[in-house]
């Protein structure tokens, strides 16, 4: 039986690979997509998501979400993904439009209609998820779990300690981590290992139409290089859904620092139980890299 999922995303070049996997992995049933400001503005992430849906000719409802963090000024990662968020490929024009309601309400409505609890997957800042949990707490029983790409048990990637998706809206992340829902965190501890090799990247143009598109995007992606390998951060959240045995997880208490002058956005992961608080997150700490790479190759071979 396919696993029903909703995907909250901020495309983003590596988001494009994660979206492809979410759509075409046979074990998954992607029923709703929502966008959030993150890698670039929400107008651009929405445009990029709609372009991808049109590229693959799939009809999945998509709702535009939060344009700004809960309480602070927005930040982006255009230096990594390009000003458009998906620089490097010329998508054809289309007339697709997002749903006419905010993302968190679209998630609420879809959860309440679903015949069984749904897995939420968030691969951008957690603003939409925080709005859902704070404004619609009645939805919690309908959430099977939340799988996120974000955070770190060690170093960061946009500050010395903070990972971008959490640092972009620390207050939202803190709200989500305090919510009591089941959370799986695929942070930099595993995503920095999730590298596609130069040899594999070189095969993409001959793989299929999607391979050509991704190869063009990857040539503009700044999370590594085509010569040294590229990190597939967001794809780890999708991989865990279908190949959890590739990941080493540990239940930990995790809090989000929202006040520190140098540490704002840090996920404080109590690996050794020093704080004596009950675990609230399953934290991914290690990855079977070869198994991950093999899975990616299998999935992308299925994509048209």
UniProtKB/Swiss-Prot annotation:
Stated family: Belongs to the IUNH family. RihC subfamily.
Annotated EC: 3.2.-.-
Entry protein name: Non-specific ribonucleoside hydrolase RihC
Pfam families per UniProt: IU_nuc_hydro
Function: Hydrolyzes both purine and pyrimidine ribonucleosides with a broad-substrate specificity.
Entry's Gene Ontology BP terms: purine nucleobase metabolic process; purine nucleoside catabolic process; pyrimidine nucleobase metabolic process
PANTHER family tied to this protein: INOSINE-URIDINE PREFERRING NUCLEOSIDE HYDROLASE (PTHR12304), NON-SPECIFIC RIBONUCLEOSIDE HYDROLASE RIHC (PTHR12304:SF15)
Cysteines paired by S-S bonds: none
One GO cellular component term: cytosol
Residue numbers annotated as active site: 233
Species of provenance: Escherichia coli O6:K15:H31 (strain 536 / UPEC)
Keywords: Glycosidase, Hydrolase
Coiled-coil annotated residue ranges, if any: none
GO MF term list: purine nucleosidase activity; uridine nucleosidase activity
Enzyme class, broadest EC rank: hydrolase
Source species, domain of life: Bacteria
């Amino acid at each position: 039986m396919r696993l029903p999922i909703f995907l909250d995303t901020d495309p983003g070049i590596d988001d494009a690979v994660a979206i492809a996997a979410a759509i075409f992995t046979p074990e998954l049933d992607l029923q709703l997509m929502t966008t959030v400001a993150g890698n670039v503005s929400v107008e651009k992430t929405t445009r990029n998501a709609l372009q991808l849906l049109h590229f693959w000719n799939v009809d999945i409802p998509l709702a535009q979400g939060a344009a700004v963090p809960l309480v602070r000024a927005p930040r982006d990662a255009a230096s990594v993904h390009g000003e458009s968020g998906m620089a490097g490929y010329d998508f054809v024009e289309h007339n697709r439009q997002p749903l006419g309601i905010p993302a968190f309400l679209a998630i609420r409505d879809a959860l309440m209609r679903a015949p069984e609890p749904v897995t939420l997957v968030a691969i951008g800042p957690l603003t939409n998820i925080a709005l859902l949990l704070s404004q619609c707490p009645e939805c919690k029983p309908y959430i099977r779990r939340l799988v996120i790409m974000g955070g770190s048990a060690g170093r960061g990637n946009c500050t010395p300690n903070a990972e971008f998706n959490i640092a972009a809206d620390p207050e939202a992340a803190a709200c989500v981590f305090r919510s009591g829902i089941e959370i799986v965190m695929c942070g930099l501890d595993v995503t920095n290992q999730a590298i596609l090799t130069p040899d594999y990247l070189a095969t993409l143009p001959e793989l299929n139409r999607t391979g050509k598109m991704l190869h063009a995007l990857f040539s503009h992606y700044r999370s590594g290089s085509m010569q040294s390998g590229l990190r597939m951060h967001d794809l780890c959240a999708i991989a865990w859904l279908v190949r959890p045995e590739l990941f080493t997880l540990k239940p930990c208490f995790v809090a989000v620092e929202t006040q520190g002058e140098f540490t704002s956005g840090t996920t404080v992961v109590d690996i050794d139980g020093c704080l004596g608080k009950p675990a609230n997150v399953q934290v991914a700490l290690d990855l079977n890299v070869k198994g991950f790479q093999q899975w990616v190759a299998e999935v992308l071979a299925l994509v048209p």
